[in-house]
From Swiss-Prot:
It comes from Clostridium novyi (strain NT). CDD domains: RNAP_beta'_C (cd02655), RNAP_beta'_N (cd01609). Its cofactor is Mg(2+); Zn(2+). This is DNA-directed RNA polymerase subunit beta'. The gene is rpoC. One of its GO terms (molecular function) is DNA-directed RNA polymerase activity.
């Protein structure tokens, strides 16, 4: 069936995609003809050779509507097959889809099924891959039918043994052959039903290694039994030849040809095949034929997967040729290069410059770029307005850039948002929509407040522009992606558009007050008078003054006097006066300014937060624009600059240094006299110098004037920090050597005084290590994000309420005594599952099934509640994705989540994006063996991959009382349970014991310090505890680095890691022991068996690392495009898997709309009923999919 015959709609309207083994008949059916010659194109005429790899008769004409010999040219002969050359007159595009085939003279095995791990062919035949290899590559005979002889079926015979057997029993007494033919016969006579029964019987009695192998064999046998595949199809009789335009040959300038590697590989196969045919016709001696067959087998192996077995076939310059498998694999393969990410039309890129005059939702687009991007729209408009008569002349107008084109362009872009994207796009805020404004020059102008989200600066960064074309796309861009609507960060719900640098500095400068400046103590009758006085220079901007304020209340005009500064008045002008910073219910505060404090970065964040909660995005973005304008203006007027003279070295520095020198001398003396050890001396010296550095820094900070520009920059949070000021004007302090150990000679100088050579040299260690770390970290973090996206990409909010009755109990997360995450943070935006009651009075604070906003959550914590049961993603019952109630609040909008939101991707981005901020280093604890605890990024990876951690803690499997015992050789901890049974644990030296003698511990508690293996927690405490452990451990790493991530993102990923059940006993079900099954499928199967009164299957929740979990997904397309492409496809093909296309990746690959947001089935199939007779409310008939 060819494309032309298919109605167009069908191509994009399929429910699922199935993969399977191709039978020889199927391959011949696909093919348009046999490729018989290895020739490609004629070197003189440059036309394809007949019957060759580029033959026009098989694959279609090279030029549109023109046959090979030239008898038929032009469209009018469409569909005619030329009687001279046999080429069909049609479009040359068919050369991208028509296939050919090669009839092999001898069958060969398909390397994927013979060489993959585990070898599928080996399993189904119950032969080891090594013996199989001997047969396939003509090293041994295999007995096909022993008949009456004492030989065994499938027994291997070497050349010598074979000849001896022939002499002994005679030529006809038994059947033994070699090569793929023999294997094909063995495969063809397998009775799958019978074999399946036998294996199931064997499974009941076998144990250990044997059981594992039986299960593996059964898995392969069942795959073949349940699919329509036949085992003998793993041996190839016919090879498909892919269309020539997918393995092109192009002429280079020098007249030479460049060709795809596949052509070389096909040529080798055809050459060897033809030679083999000839040899068989001639009746050549067996040994020659056998050699040729082996070479054909190797040629086919190289074509399918070069380098999988033996040395790869190389091209010029010893480069291995790219085989069909390599075309799919890796970052440059078909999946990741062309299917998941494509280059698109209507896009451009350019350097970005700052546009402080823009509104929050605007961006500046260079004129010539805009004209090129909106060309078709401009052309259409020109024709409509009558400036051009037809589309051709309007195209000419645009290309010649006539003056009237610009007015039309203005009109076209006025309501047409564009998308701006900066690579690397680490989270969804890396692509936002803006209303374009035409600008001169060639640079894109960007609003300064969106820089944080893009992580952009103006030192030469580039950005890409994309144009949403359809009306729907424009609407989505405007409502969902407009920069003014994306004020909150999806990862933690805090504002991402907080003003930075100059804007903070200006606001800080405005809200400062100063004693004894011009105009202090003056009283003004209204704010306008203050502004007049300030503008005429009568008062200073920081002067403390009094002003009479008036406002209207209940229709009456009331007034009152407040004390403030002109700066604060100006700043408050841009802020709504009811954000809740001032308690307005108190009459004294009636006229008080809303922002009556010093504005720093932190406070600005609070202002934006409150404004967003109260007024929403639009109002907030206007406020931000006002703050931006004021900030820039007054930081310029304030003329806050930085110079060497601003760095004042504290007078007490020299005294502090000499004091420390004396103290260190004392410590040295004690060491020399043997009072303290080398380690102790080192520790004390380091401690002394650390203290001194701290003292110098404090002296410096006390010394600085409040109006010192450097102090202002650091204090306001505009730029720099206390530690940087310390280095500029205090002393640099202690540095580490390349191994991470601290050098005990501190750097005494500050940058202001200048470093000497030794000091400078010591400084370089840290700097270099920092650079190396950053480079490594970026790659690691990127790879972590990729795995996270892959594991959680199909988690979409698919229903309103899954009806789950189980909750997840949360309390604050602590590390030692330090609270890492408060209860309020964990409750905000969640649903309660039961009544939350006050522990003292027993009154209900929050009824069951109530959505808790920040205020409610805070109220719960204030009432002294310690633990709360909430709806959580962990306990969600939705089979695919999650439900809105278990998920709770959408962090990016601070409202309840909508159905169709792709929360999986957002979760992965929220965890991955801050990855680069986490450290790489392992903390060394004073050289104690086995106590290196991993932190930062490697720790996060360790947790998500569910690996056995470094610095493993020993945990107890039973609850009981502790008894410590120390011998010369080792330390032992005994745990005596309630029955008096003693379980002992050996503790290696160097581990620190956490428990004390006689203390009571529960199962799963740590005996020594370190990280616990999550698999142990799962085994001892169960799935609930392990989820909790993973969540709080990842949170600890991020929080210690000052990165806030909301729990729900981690919950989404951890849930994906614990979705599978490992089957123990299969009972009366079809499930095989040892296999992984989805939790919901497992329950479904058991429910069916239960109704029939059979024996249910048993199994335990398995904890998979994110890589494993991503590969264990139902969708083979998603798994194959992630990692281990060949393995995934081999497996899927044998099982005849069908991909239900539920996730995002699968749909991107096949080019459908993703099933999230407006792409969900329920929105795609909306029909408008025009029948007015029906009820008016039910105008839109939403088809629930």
């Amino acid at each position: 069936m060819w494309r032309e015959d298919l109605p167009l709609i069908e191509l994009n309207n399929f429910e699922a995609l199935q993969i399977g083994l191709a039978s020889p008949e199927q391959i011949r059916e696909w093919s348009r003809g046999e490729v018989k010659k290895p020739e490609t194109i004629n070197y003189r005429t440059l036309k394809p050779e007949k019957d060759g790899l580029f033959c026009e008769r098989i694959f279609g004409p090279i030029k549109d509507w023109e046959c090979h010999c030239g008898k038929y040219k032009r469209v009018r002969y469409k569909g005619i097959v030329c009687d001279r050359c046999g080429v069909e007159v049609t479009k040359s595009k068919v050369r991208r889809e028509r296939m050919g085939h090669i009839e092999l003279a001898a069958p060969v095995s398909h390397i994927w099924y013979f060489k993959g791990i585990p070898s599928r062919m080996g399993l189904i035949l119950d032969m080891s891959p090594r013996s199989l290899e001997k047969v396939l590559y003509f090293a041994s005979y295999v007995v096909l039918d022993p008949k009456e002889t004492p030989l065994l079926k499938k027994q291997l015979l070497s050349e010598k043994e074979y000849r001896e057997s022939v002499d002994k029993y005679g030529e006809e007494a038994f059947d033994a052959e070699m090569g793929a033919e023999a294997v094909k016969k063995l495969l063809a006579e397998i009775d799958l039903e019978q074999l399946s029964k036998e294996l199931k019987e064997a499974l009941k009695t076998s144990t250990g290694q044997k059981k594992v192998r039986t299960i593996r064999r059964l898995e392969v046998v069942e795959s073949f039994r349940k699919s329509t595949n036949r085992p003998e199809w793993m041996i190839i009789d016919v090879i498909p030849v892919i269309p020539p335009d997918l393995r092109p040959m192009v002429q280079l300038d020098g007249g030479r040809f460049a060709t795809s590697d596949l052509n070389d590989l096909y040529r080798r196969v055809i050459n060897r095949n033809n030679r083999l045919k000839k040899l068989l016709d001639l009746g050549a001696p067996d040994i020659i034929v056998r050699n040729e067959k082996r070479m054909l087998q190797e040629a086919v192996d190289a074509l399918i997967d070069n380098g999988r077995r033996g040395r790869p076939v190389t091209g010029p310059g010893n480069r291995p040729l790219k085989s069909l498998s390599d075309m799919l694999k890796g970052k440059q393969g078909r999946f990741r290069q062309n299917l998941l990410g494509k280059r698109v039309d209507y896009s451009g890129r350019s350097v970005i410059v700052v546009g402080p005059e823009l509104k929050m939702y605007q961006c500046g687009l260079p004129k010539e770029m805009a004209l090129e991007l909106f060309k078709p729209f401009v052309m259409k408009k020109l024709v409509e307005s009558g400036a051009a008569h037809n589309i051709k002349s309007s195209k000419k107008m645009v290309e010649r850039v006539m003056p009237q084109v610009w007015d039309v362009l203005e009109e076209v872009i006025s309501e047409h948002p564009v998308l701006l994207n900066r690579a690397p796009t680490l989270h969804r805020l890396g692509i936002q929509a803006f209303q374009p404004v035409l600008v001169e020059g060639r640079a894109i102008k960007l609003h300064p407040l969106v820089c944080t989200a893009y992580n952009a600066d103006f030192d030469g960064d580039q950005m890409a522009v994309h144009v949403p074309l359809s009306v729907e796309a424009q609407a989505e861009a405007r409502f969902l992606m407009l920069a003014a609507n994306n004020i909150l960060k999806p990862s933690d719900g805090k504002p991402v558009c907080v003003p930075t640098q100059d804007m903070i500095l200006g606001s800080y400068y405005l809200t400062l007050d100063k004693d004894g400046v011009k105009g202090e103590g003056k009283i003004f009758s209204n704010p306008d008078e203050v502004m007049m006085a300030y503008q005429t220079g009568a008062i200073n901007i920081h002067a403390k003054i009094k002003v009479r304020m008036t406002k209207e209340k209940d229709g009456k005009i009331i007034s009152g006097i407040i004390e403030t500064t002109p700066g604060k008045l100006i700043f408050n002008d841009s802020i709504p006066q009811d954000l809740g910073f001032v308690d307005r219910s108190n009459p004294e505060n009636e006229f008080k300014l809303e922002i009556d404090f010093l504005v720093t970065k932190k406070n600005l964040g609070k202002i934006i937060d409150k404004c967003y909660t109260k007024y929403g995005a639009t109002e907030t973005s206007t406020m931000l624009d006002k703050i931006k304008a004021r900030g820039y203006h007054y930081s310029t007027i304030g003329a806050i600059t930085i110079s060497v003279s601003d760095m004042t070295v504290p007078e007490s520095k020299n005294r502090l240094l000499s004091d420390t020198d004396l103290a260190v001398e004392k410590i040295e003396k004690m060491y020399r006299r043997g009072f303290i050890s080398e380690d102790e001396r080192y520790e004390r010296v380091i401690e002394k110098w650390t203290q001194t550095t701290e003292d110098v820094a404090n002296a410096l900070m006390d010394n600085l004037d409040r109006f010192n520009p450097i102090f202002m920059m650091a204090d306001s949070g505009a730029r720099g920090s206390k530690s940087q000021i310390k280095q500029l004007a205090g002393m640099r302090g202690l540095m580490a050597n390349p191994s991470g150990k601290i050098i005990e000679l501190p750097i005494r100088a500050s940058f202001r005084e200048g470093l000497d050579v030794l000091e400078y040299f010591i400084s370089t260690h840290g700097a270099r290590k920092g650079n190396a770390d950053t480079a490594l970290k970026t790659a690691d973090s990127g790879y972590l994000t990729r795995r996270l996206v892959d594991v959680s990409q199909d988690v979409i909010v698919r229903e309103e309420d899954c009806g789950s009755t189980h909750g997840y109990e949360v309390s604050e997360i602590k590390e030692g005594n330090e609270v890492i995450e408060t209860l309020t943070e964990r409750l905000t935006g969640r649903y309660s599952i039961e009544d939350i009651v006050d522990p003292q009075t027993g009154e209900v604070i929050v009824p069951a099934d109530t959505y808790m906003n920040a205020d409610l959550a805070e109220k719960v914590e204030k009432h002294g509640v310690k633990k709360v049961n909430i709806r959580s993603v962990f306990t969600c019952k939705s089979k695919h994705g999650v439900c809105a109630k278990c998920y709770g609040m959408n962090m990016a909008t601070a409202n309840k989540i909508n159905i169709g939101e792709s929360v999986g991707i957002v979760a992965a981005q929220s965890i991955g994006e801050p990855g680069t901020q986490l450290t790489m280093r392992t903390f060394h604890t004073g050289g104690v063996a086995g106590a290196d605890i991993t932190q930062g990024l490697p720790r996060v990876e360790e947790l998500f991959e569910a690996r056995k951690p470094k610095g493993l803690a020993i945990i107890t499997e039973v609850a009981g009382t502790v008894k410590l015992e120390e011998t010369k050789k080792k330390r032992i901890v005994h745990v005596i349970d309630d029955e008096g049974v003693d379980k002992s644990y050996d503790i290696p030296f160097g581990s620190r014991i956490k428990v004390s003698n006689g203390s009571r511990i529960e199962a799963g508690d740590e005996i020594t310090e370190g990280s616990v293996n999550p698999h142990d927690i799962l085994a001892i405490k169960g799935p609930k505890e392990v989820k909790n452990y993973l969540l709080s451990e990842v949170q600890k790493v991020y929080r210690l680095q000052g990165v806030d991530i909301n729990d729900k993102h981690l919950e989404v990923v951890v849930r994906q890691m614990t979705r599978k059940v490992k089957i123990k006993e299969s009972g009366d079900t079809e499930l095989l022991p040892g296999t992984l099954v989805d939790v919901f499928d497992f329950e479904e199967v058991n429910e069916k068996i239960r109704q029939q009164g059979g024996e249910e299957a048993t199994g335990d929740i398995a904890l998979l690392g994110i890589t494993k979990a991503a590969l264990a997904t139902d969708s083979f397309l998603s798994a194959a495009s992630f990692q281990e492409t060949t393995r995934v496809l081999t497996d899927a093909a044998i099982k005849g898997k069908s991909d239900p296309l539920l996730g995002l990746k699968e749909n991107v690959i096949i080019g459908k709309l993703i099933p999230a947001g407006t792409g969900m089935m329920r929105y795609r199939s909306i029909k408008l009923n025009t029948d007015k007779e029906e009820n008016d409310e039910e105008l839109v008939n939403v088809d629930e999919a």
